[in-house]
Amino acid sequence: TQAAEVRESISLTGQFAAVDEVLTGRENLVLVARLRHLKEPGAIADDLLRRFSLAEAGTRRVATYSGGMRRRLDIAMSLIGNPQVIFLDEPTTGLDPEARIEVWQAVKELAKGGTTVLLTTQYLDEAEHLADRLAILHEGRIIVNGTLDELKQLLPPAKIEYVEKQPSLEDVFLTLVGAKTDKEQR
């Protein structure tokens, strides 16, 4: 039926990772592929583990994964069956800065690959980095939507002032742990 086809083309990843911590990452993916009655669930799992930089961790129990790894696995599970549209509900809530960047990379790759990504976030910097179109909700209603440039045009022209930029705490953290910032990865 048409309704079934629509349901097959849409996937959802909730605010909190819905992974089975007793299973390995690969077992989680194989389980979902089997539940969707797909052929070659092992090959599907291996492909997604590679795509989400989890191949080395695939045989470990999910309980040993970091927050970012769990979120990437959760997103990978949502992609089983190749949905055309994926809803991500606050995918980086509660993650450390390094894990947030890992999830941002995964989301960018999805969009680059042709998947339509609908993402909710409370982090405005995240919306700026990831979205090509934005909708701002206030008190349960969409009050404006458009591209970032269109939304910026709603404000009066900015006054230019020279302000020396000091590194943020996030910049310090990412430098100390040797991670690349989102800007450095572009």
Which positions does each model-derived feature cover?
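Conserved catalytic motifs of ABC-family nucleotide-binding domains
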Residues: 82
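ABC ATPase "signature
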Residues: 145-146
